[in-house]
Amino acid sequence: MTRIILILTATFFACALGASTGGSHPLRPWWNALRSSGRIVGGFEVPVEEVPFQVSLSGVGSSHFCGGSLLSERWVMTAGHCAASGQTNLQVRIGSSQHASGGQLIKVKKVNRHPKYDEVTTDYDFALLELEETVTFSDSCAPVKLPQKDAPVNEGTCLQVSGWGNTQNPSESSEVLRAAYVPAVSQKECHKAYLSFGGVTDRMVCAGFKEGGKDSCQGDSGGPLVHDNTLVGVVSWGYGCAQAGYPGVYARVASVRDWVKEVSGL
């Protein structure tokens, strides 16, 4: 119980202290300024045992390019822009703090991208990956909880994002799993911030500090945004990485619970 209290206290202060502590797109002319494939900026190294649902997605015989979240023994959720329906030769690594070694390496049997995924607006940025083999659960490999349908994310809620992406700091390796705490931003505030880019939809949730400094970045896309071991969002897009005035934008998992159940039974 003491450890739980200490972790919760540390989490609160991580969000309260804020930033002081610490690919091209053919249909969007401004896509290079935005990052559609998430990395943790301003975060800290984290053992996979603290985020045992974290998944690394790669092509068979190639390197990590997106993150994901383990939902069950056979299902992983990632971003729609990370994997297209019908795509083959994908694999996931689960249960390792390194994206290139350790843990369980399992091939993807089938990619189910959300049928309403929009490449222009990045709306419905979800994909469910069915695995060829059953995952063996352990301290370093366990599923994340799914939220209730349309569950709200209250402004200021302290959320954790994790992945192996670009840290924007040459002294910090992105080979090792990293995480950062970021507060949820109101839908109204986020929509206003991104109005010149078309705004955000009800399938999106935003998180980050007004002053910037902590965020996901290139390479983290598809990875988890969690609160209380529940998958709140999927790393999706944003303007730059950890830019002041531009919170990270995540695909809101609670908005597609019916689809998740229809496809995976979860």
UniProtKB/Swiss-Prot annotation:
Documented EC number(s): 3.4.21.4
Primary location group: secreted
Disulphide bridges: 66-82, 190-206, 217-241
Any single biological process term in GO: digestion
Site (Required for specificity): 215
Cellular component, GO, one term: extracellular region
Signal peptide extent: 1-18
Top enzyme category: hydrolase
Compartment(s) of residence: Secreted, Extracellular space
Location of the active site: 81, 125, 221
Start and end residues of each Peptidase S1 domain: 40-265
Tissue: Midgut.
Classification via Gene3D superfamilies: Trypsin-like serine proteases
Residue ranges the record assigns to the propeptide: 19-39
Reaction(s) this enzyme catalyzes, per UniProt: Preferential cleavage: Arg-|-Xaa, Lys-|-Xaa
Keywords: Digestion, Disulfide bond, Hydrolase, Protease, Secreted, Serine protease, Signal, Zymogen
GO molecular function: serine-type endopeptidase activity
Short name of one Pfam family: Trypsin
Domain of life: Eukaryota
Family annotation (InterPro entries): Peptidase_S1 (IPR050430), Peptidase_S1_PA (IPR009003), Peptidase_S1_PA_chymotrypsin (IPR043504), Peptidase_S1A (IPR001314), Trypsin_dom (IPR001254), TRYPSIN_HIS (IPR018114), TRYPSIN_SER (IPR033116)
Protein purpose: Major function may be to aid in digestion of the blood meal.
Family stated for the protein in its record: Belongs to the peptidase S1 family.
Protein name (database record): Trypsin 5G1
Organism of this sequence: Aedes aegypti (Yellowfever mosquito)
